[in-house]
Structures are given as structure tokens and as C-alpha cells.
Amino acid sequence: VEQFVQDRCRALEDSINAKFPTVRWKLFEMQINGGINDVCQAYIPCGGSLVSYGSANTASQVNADIEIINVLSEHYEIYLPLFADNSERVNVIAPTKSQFISLAVSTDSELKIETKEAV
């Protein structure tokens, strides 16, 4: 029975991870005694390897956020505007079908709004 439950947990984790291009999820932690703990940890690409979300730099976190939102948007067929704060730290922003609103620090004395046409 324990082996069946472990295999089922792995299959669930694999099916969820298959929906994400680069983000990987750890949903279960196998215990020494054969038990299983529920967890929900995201691992994202950063510097050529996968690291926990909290250990990644801002650019990696922003792009992982976009990827997660893209997958959920596609699944539910709902595309809402995305707001990204601290985006001045991101050189390459992941593509999205949603409207993307980038908030960036500026030395300008007045609020400035710049628009770009969708590609």
C-alpha cells in the first residue's frame, strides 16, 4: 500500500511538472519511515541550475512568476494584466500572452508612462 501511495504521489508531481517549461515543483517529501509529507516548493532556473524560489535572484523570480501565471492562465483560459515590480533588475522578461505592466525605479522627477505595441 505504501509503495502504491508513493508511486501515485510521484505520478501526480510528474504530471504537474510536465505543464511547466522550466519551473519544477516538489509537492511531497518521502519520510524515512515510508510516510509522506505534503509540501509545495517551487524550484526555478537561476545561474544554470535549479534553486528554490526563495534563493533565486529577482530576475529569475520575476520570470518564474510569469511562467506560473502563463500556465495557470492557459489552464483556466483567463488572461489578466500582469504587474511586475522591480523589473528594472530583469534584462530579459519571459514572454506572456497577458498584458504586461512593468514597474521600474526611475530618477525622473515626474511619473512617466511608456507604452510598447505587442509583438
Regions found by a protein language model. Give the residues of each.
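Glycine-rich/acidic phosphate-handling loop/turn and adjacent ATP-lid/helix
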Residues: V51-A59, V90
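GG-anchored amphipathic helix commonly corresponding to the ABC/SMC/Rad50 NBD signature/C-loop
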Residues: A59-P81
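Short beta-turn/strand-loop junction motif enriched in small, turn-promoting residues
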Residues: W25, I69-V71, R89
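Charged, surface-exposed helical/loop "interaction arms" that form contiguous linear patches used
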Residues: V1-Y43, G48-S52, E77-Y79
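Walker B catalytic acidic pair
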Residues: D85-S87
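C-terminal lobe/lid and adjacent interdomain/linker elements of RecA-like ASCE P-loop ATPase modules
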Residues: K97-V119
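Conserved ATPase-coupling elements of RecA-like P-loop NTPase cores
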Residues: V90-T96
